[in-house]
Each structure stands twice: as C-alpha cells, then as structure tokens.
C-alpha cells in the first residue's frame, strides 16, 4: 500500500480526507498515467449512491478533461459494471467512485485499466509520485484539444445483458429475496432477476444519498434472513454498496458466506469440467472448514493475503478461474475481471436450478469451524503490529491452541483497524482466545 492508495483504491472521509481538490488531482494524474500513450483517450466513470458521489465525480471529470481525455459518465452503476464496460467500450481507463461496504461519510476512487483489471502496484506508484510533486508539470491542452464529457446511462443495461447470458435457464418457479444495501445495485438487481422470471421480494432499494449500507446489505445479512423467512423465499441475496460482494441466505434463514458460496461453485464447476487446474484461490481469512470441504472433494486450494486484488493476481498468475474471500468477493474470471455480486448470485441460483437442490443442502456440505472476528480501532496500525506485548500474547495463544485452530491478527487495508480473528473447535474457546488478544491491543494502541 502507498501513501494514497490502499488495498482498494484511494479512500477517506469525503470532503475532509478525500477532498474535491484531491479528486481533481487523482483524475488529472491518474488519467495521464493510464492514457498517456493514446490520442484522445476515453475514460468512463461510475459511482454508487453516496451523497458525496456527485461532488467527487465533478472534480474527477474536471481533472480528466484537463488532460485531454474524453469522459463518459455512467451514473449509478456497480463496480464490476465499470470493470466490464471499460473493456467492452474500448475505454483506456475506468473509474469507480465508491467506498464499497463502508459508511456513507466515506468515499473512494478506484481505477481500472483498459483490460478491465484493477491497477498494478507500479501504476499506483506512478500516480502517487505525480501527486507528491510540488509542481504540476503535465501538459495542459487548450481549445479543441481539451476533453469533452458525455453521458452513457445505458451502460448498466449493457452490463446486465452480458451477465444474464452466463446462466443456462431462467429462474421461473423460484422466489428470490434481494437486499441491495440502498447502493449501486438498487435498480439493477431487481430488474435482472425479474427479467429472469423469478418472483422477487426486495429491501434496501430506496437510496437517498445517505442510507447506503445503513443496517442493510452484505454486512447485515441477518435483516435479509428475516425477509426470507417472512416471504417464504427460496434464497436471499445481499449485496454491498458497490455491488462487488455477495452474501446469501438459505431458505431456512441461515447465512451463507463467501467461503460457502466459493465451495458450492467449486464443487459444481469441478463436476461440470469447468474448474481450471482443479484449484480455488482464497485468502488467509477463509474458514478451516472451507479447506476441509475442498479436500474431501479432491479440490486444491491456493491462499493469498487478504484483499481481492491479491486473489486476482494469483488467479492470473496460475491461470485459475475461481477465487474469492469470505466477505463475499467472488471472482469468476471466465466472465469478469473483478469480484461481482450479481454475477455470483446468478451462478449460485443457477447451481440450485441445475442440481435441483435447496441452498441449505448445497451449503450444508461444508462444515464451518466456529470463528470470531473482532475489529479494534487503533491509533497506528503499524505500531500495533510491532508492539512486543501484542506479539507475545499472540505467541502464547498459538502455543495453547497447539495446532487445533488458528489465530490471525492483521491490519485493515482501508480503515484504522486491527482485525483479530480466531478459529477453534468450539465457539467458547474461540471467543476466549480473541478477547484475550483484543484486550492487549486495546490497552497498547487502542483509539478512544
């Protein structure tokens, strides 16, 4: 991670850390780095439903236009929609304005290259070097060489038509409950599943600029679980604010997380000859039960650091086509170049149709180890990892576990948090281990 770019672009509190002035510079310098070898380059921009999206979009557009780029605004659209359209529309770059699952006061800016993939570390470093320069020495075109802006609000429908053709049958006869987090999928997901002839019930589909992710979406699936039980739905699908995550709910109201969704997809893809190199790429946060279920089905796993960008890098390196995170980022590289909540949802429902099995049965083939994750707000993430007392309590707990479970302590890539996670044979033991470490982290580097 750099000074400005975290694991998922540039993020911060809108109008304080992520200011219009910074957004202008990011547009100008980012646009230059990604389009400098192209005459009259095209850059597309999408955003989620946050109140700050318009402000940041205006500044970004101005920065891009100042380099001579032609800018196409997509309006409210999901992050994977921007990734797909960047390549489909032959744009030199795509930009998404979103802070994903974060609260409304945050916002972020992430770029996609002409191939639809997120930027490399080298590209981000080049942009950061320009941001840190005291003097802006980039060319300043004038007159007819300046860029122009246009709107392409049909982009969302073009993207939906693309992902819709990845399933084999319609979804008639199924009742699907949707939670769109008052975010980027609020209009898109209900249209998509209704178009596939499913009966739908919805929540989180009334964005007002301030309610994105507020007690709804993939970080609050328990709310959708109540709707599933109330309506007698066959499945619930919860997306996050920018639509790159999926958490599901089975017909009994049980939450089905990213690990379980990956396992279901991996098993089906292996059975149908689609799983490349018989391998799934996941992160160190995936549940031990996920790996045991893969082993039982003779499927290989490959672990990376936390962050969908690292999963993607490993997938590209090894030629794999399925990967993801427990948090619900599922990457289906045969179809798209980033995590995609709606595409993952289509595949999950399609597997239910093809196997004629309810989601509870599909998910039940994986037994999860009890797990607890606690986020501790800290004054300094780097100091926390170097603190001797914190390192000592982690060592003591790992010795007590004696291989029967695991501890993972790591910094958040996007927020001032230390994440403390444990897995153990029982929830009671798991909770005790986590809280012992959390107490030390709070005492040593905890923020008020």
UniProtKB/Swiss-Prot annotation:
GO terms for cellular component: cytosol. Mg(2+) binds at residues 100, 240, 242, 244. One of its GO terms (biological process) is UDP-N-acetylglucosamine biosynthetic process. Binds 1 Mg(2+) ion per subunit. GO terms for molecular function: magnesium ion binding; phosphoglucosamine mutase activity; phosphomannomutase activity. The keyword Magnesium applies. Activated by phosphorylation. Pfam families: PGM_PMM_I, PGM_PMM_II, PGM_PMM_III, PGM_PMM_IV. The modification Phosphoserine is found at residue 100. It is an enzyme of class 5 (isomerase). Keywords: Isomerase, Magnesium, Metal-binding, Phosphoprotein. CDD domains: GlmM (cd05802). It catalyses: alpha-D-glucosamine 1-phosphate = D-glucosamine 6-phosphate. InterPro entries: A-D-PHexomutase_a/b/a-I, A-D-PHexomutase_a/b/a-I/II/III, A-D-PHexomutase_a/b/a-II, A-D-PHexomutase_a/b/a-III, A-D-PHexomutase_C, A-D-PHexomutase_C_sf, A-D-PHexomutase_CS, Alpha-D-phosphohexomutase_SF. Its cofactor is Mg(2+). The active site is at residue 100. Its EC number is 5.4.2.10. Catalyzes the conversion of glucosamine-6-phosphate to glucosamine-1-phosphate. Belongs to the phosphohexose mutase family. This is Phosphoglucosamine mutase. It comes from Bacillus thuringiensis (strain Al Hakam). The gene is glmM.
């Amino acid at each position: 991670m750099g000074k400005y770019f975290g694991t998922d672009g540039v993020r911060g509190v809108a109008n304080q850390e992520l200011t219009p002035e910074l957004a202008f510079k990011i547009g100008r310098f980012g646009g230059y780095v990604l389009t400098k070898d192209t005459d009259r380059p095209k850059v597309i921009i999408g955003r989620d439903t946050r109140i700050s999206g318009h402000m940041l979009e205006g500044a970004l557009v101005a920065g891009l236009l100042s380099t001579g780029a032609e800018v196409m605004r997509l309006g409210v659209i999901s992050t994977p929609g921007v990734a797909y359209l960047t390549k489909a529309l032959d744009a030199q770059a795509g930009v998404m304005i979103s802070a994903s699952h974060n609260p409304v006061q945050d916002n972020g800016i992430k770029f996609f290259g002409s191939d639809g993939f997120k930027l490399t570390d080298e590209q981000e470093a080049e942009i950061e070097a320009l941001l840190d320069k005291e003097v802006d020495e980039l060319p300043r075109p004038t007159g007819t060489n300046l860029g122009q802006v246009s709107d392409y609000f049909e982009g969302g429908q073009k993207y939906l038509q693309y992902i819709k053709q990845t399933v084999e049958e319609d979804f008639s006869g199924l009742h699907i409950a949707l939670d769109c987090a008052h975010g980027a999928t609020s209009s898109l997901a209900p249209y998509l599943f209704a178009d596939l002839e499913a009966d739908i019930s919805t929540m989180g589909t009334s964005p007002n600029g301030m309610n994105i992710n507020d007690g709804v979406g993939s970080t609050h699936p328990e709310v959708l679980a109540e709707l599933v039980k109330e309506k007698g739905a066959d499945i619930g699908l919860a997306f996050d604010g920018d639509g790159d995550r999926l958490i599901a709910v089975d017909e009994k109201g049980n939450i089905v997380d990213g690990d379980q969704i990956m396992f279901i997809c991996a098993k089906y893809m292996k059975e149908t000859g689609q799983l490349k190199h018989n391998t799934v790429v996941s992160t160190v946060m995936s549940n031990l039960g996920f790996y045991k279920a893969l082993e039982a089905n003779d499927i290989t796993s490959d672990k990376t650091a936390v962050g969908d960008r690292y999963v993607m890098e490993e997938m590209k390196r090894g030629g794999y086509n399925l990967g993801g995170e427990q948090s619900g980022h599922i990457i289906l590289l045969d179809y798209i170049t980033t995590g995609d909540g709606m595409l993952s949802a289509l595949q999950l429902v399609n597997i239910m149709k093809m196997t004629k099995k309810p989601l509870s049965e599909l998910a039940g083939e994986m037994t999860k180890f009890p797990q607890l994750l606690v986020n501790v707000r800290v004054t300094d993430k780097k100091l926390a990892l170097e603190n001797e007392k914190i390192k000592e309590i982690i060592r003591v707990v790992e010795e007590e576990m004696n291989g029967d479970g695991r501890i993972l302590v790591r910094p958040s890539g996007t927020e001032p948090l230390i994440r403390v996670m444990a897995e153990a044979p029982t929830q009671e033991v798991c909770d005790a281990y986590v809280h012992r470490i959390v107490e030390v982290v709070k005492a040593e580097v905890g923020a008020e």
